[in-house]
Amino acid sequence: MISTLRRAVFLRRFPAVVSPIKRAFSSRIDDEFDPQIMNINELNQEMQSIFGQEPSPDGPGTMDFSELKSSKIEPLRSKNIDFRQQIEYHKSTHSSKNDSQAIEQYAKVASDMSKLTHVGIAGEAQMVDVSSKDNSKRTALACCKVILGKRVFDLVLANQMGKGDVLGVAKIAGINGAKQTSSLIPLCHNIALTHVRVDLRLNPEDFSVDIEGEASCTGKTGVEMEAMTAVSVAGLTVYDMCKAASKDISITDVRLERKTGGKSGSWSRL
């Protein structure tokens, strides 16, 4: 009687015992070949590398956040970066050879940016404060070349362009351009110019117009941009006066030739 009763109890409990074993065995086989499960396993490994443990099977509520690897998580940085603060921050949180090289590169960028007077410490554009500088005599000479081609060159030489005197109009345009520099170049100062000269010369060797512009003032900042704007606007005006005859005209070699005055002293390309 007792033996029969034990057999009946065992048979009733047998499905409950075997079913989880069967499910576990079947699940293990399916998991090894199911790509979705494989992706989940890879995700779990990545989560473990970040948080120090795999997600709990009982849900996110049981995860032990006290064991997070804080070294993997860095605070968000402002978009306007103070490079000196960033360098100190990286020095305090990184120590490997690669990190040291990155810090050195970071410091070099910050040093280079400190030489750009129109760029602030956080990398933002700024207009330089020149109020502390002394007034001094300043000059700048710039030039450019407009290549016309032989046919257009001959028309300009003979003053046969439909719009009129090419060189005369371009000369006035260049002088006016120098006076408008602070309106055209956003971070330039509004300078009280004392003199502007623009000369245009036809060059038969390469069928071009050679343009030279000079600006001067007595003030706290230089006139390099005024001289370069003068020759640039003069060159554009030559193009505008001649474009009806040819579109194949190029403006080249816009550059500063020399400057004088100011704290940096004199400079010459020659």
UniProtKB/Swiss-Prot annotation:
It catalyses: (8S)-3',8-cyclo-7,8-dihydroguanosine 5'-triphosphate = cyclic pyranopterin phosphate + diphosphate. The keyword Signal does not apply. Its EC number is 4.6.1.17. InterPro entries: MoaC, MoaC_bact/euk, MoaC_sf, MoCo_biosynth_MoaA/MoaC, Mopterin_CF_biosynth-C_dom. Pfam families: MoaC. The keyword Aminoacyl-tRNA synthetase does not apply. Substrate binds at L187, C188, H189, M225, E226. GO terms for molecular function: cyclic pyranopterin monophosphate synthase activity. It is an enzyme of class 4 (lyase). One of its GO terms (cellular component) is mitochondrial matrix. Transmembrane segments: none annotated. One of its GO terms (biological process) is Mo-molybdopterin cofactor biosynthetic process. It is found in: Mitochondrion matrix. Residues 1-32 form a transit peptide. Its main location: mitochondrion. It comes from the Eukaryota. Pathway: Cofactor biosynthesis; molybdopterin biosynthesis. Abundantly expressed in the roots. Keywords: Lyase, Mitochondrion, Molybdenum cofactor biosynthesis, Transit peptide. The active site is at D240. Catalyzes the conversion of (8S)-3',8-cyclo-7,8-dihydroguanosine 5'-triphosphate to cyclic pyranopterin monophosphate (cPMP). Belongs to the MoaC family. Homohexamer. This is Cyclic pyranopterin monophosphate synthase, mitochondrial.
